[in-house]
Regions:
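Extreme N-terminus of proteins, especially the signal/transit-peptide cleavage junction
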Residues: 1-4, 299-300
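ABC transporter nucleotide-binding domains
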Residues: 3-8, 13-206, 210-212
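Structural motif detector for alpha-helix initiation sites
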Residues: 30, 95, 216, 285-288
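Short acidic active-site motifs
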Residues: 72, 215, 268
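ABC transporter nucleotide-binding domain
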Residues: 172-261
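Short, charged/small-residue-rich alpha-helical element at the C-terminal edge
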Residues: 225-299, 303
Length: 303
């Protein structure tokens, strides 16, 4: 991955008195899958709309492939495949007719047979009228229209919304394939397991502020692990005072079982245990969801 595909610098957006984006700084690398995490109202959709000049920020600068969306909105839109989060498809088109219409409007379009193959993979019947489709099938049409052109960037706002688990997985497979072919993927989601499966890096947004950005694996690895140790005999003298990343949560009365938190690397912790008669060691590694919830707790511990 080289170069910058998307750059936001000190971006602010107000809706009346509501400060939706609060000085957002963000860089997305060319060719990566960037997962943008946050619940409804955090600022995910507002960010994407600003990047496409569908709405305009009050302050700050945005560049997509080096272009300013406010000065070159048509050029930016031509280089981006976009799936909106509030997708609304109406009218007398069939799904096939709609996709053919979009294909005529776009340059550098994908082979029609390739689109048919994608439709088959996500189990979409193309000859029904859009107005008669379920919301899940409308979502599939929306995904396909974002794939009509071969573009360097895709912006997908909640791409698996309304889909069943099998179709969600297939959509993620398609997204990964596009990235493998060099496309930069920026996708927002509130479904943590999806982001964990495919994102190279993750940004967590809370109330319009980017509170964390990191490699997905790095974010999980540096989180707090929970370890439960069972000893073959009582170990009343177990001492972790020399390790600043260990916090003892619970010790059984017979001193045969300990529950601890281990922050960051595990090497020193494991070496300390080598001096004791360990029967069993269980380590719970947090999911991305648990990491995410840590960032979303306020000062009272409430989410």
């Amino acid at each position: 991955m080289t170069g910058t595909a998307i750059q936001l610098t000190k971006v602010h957006k107000y809706y009346g008195k509501v400060h939706a984006l609060r000085g957002l700084d963000l860089e997305v690398h060319q060719g990566e899958i960037f997962g943008f995490l946050g619940p409804n109202g955090a600022g995910k959709t507002t960010t994407i709309r600003c990047m496409l000049d569908l709405i305009r920020p009050n302050h700050g600068s945005i560049r997509v492939l080096g272009l300013d969306p406010q000065k070159s909105p048509t050029a930016v839109k031509a280089k981006v495949g976009y799936l909106p989060g509030d997708l609304k498809l109406e009218g007398d088109f069939t799904a096939r007719g709609f996709l053919q219409h979009i294909r005529r409007l776009r340059r550098n379009h994908r082979d029609w047979d390739d689109l048919l193959d994608l439709a088959e993979r996500i189990d979409l019947t193309l000859d029904q009228k859009i107005e008669n489709l379920s919301q899940g099938n409308k979502q599939k049409v929306g995904l396909l229209q974002s794939l009509v052109s071969k573009v360097p960037v895709m912006m997908l706002d909640e791409p698996t919304l309304g889909l069943d688990p099998l179709m969600k997985q297939e959509v993620l497979n398609i997204v990964r394939e596009e990235a493998d072919n060099g496309t930069t993927i920026f996708f927002s989601s509130h479904i943590l397991s999806e982001v964990q499966k495919i994102a190279d890096r993750v940004g967590i947004i809370r109330k319009g502020i980017l509170v964390e950005i990191a490699q997905t694996d790095e974010l999980i690895n540096r989180a707090i692990n929970c370890a439960t140790i069972q000893f073959k005999e009582s170990v009343p003298d177990l001492d972790f005072n020399h390790l600043s990343n260990i916090k003892v949560l619970r010790i059984n009365d017979d001193h045969r079982s300990y529950t601890l938190e281990v922050a960051g690397e595990m090497d020193s912790f494991i070496k300390t245990l080598a001096d004791y008669p360990v029967r069993d060691l269980a380590i719970h590694r947090p999911s991305l969801e648990e990491v995410f919830l840590k960032y979303y707790k306020d000062d009272t511990g409430e989410v």
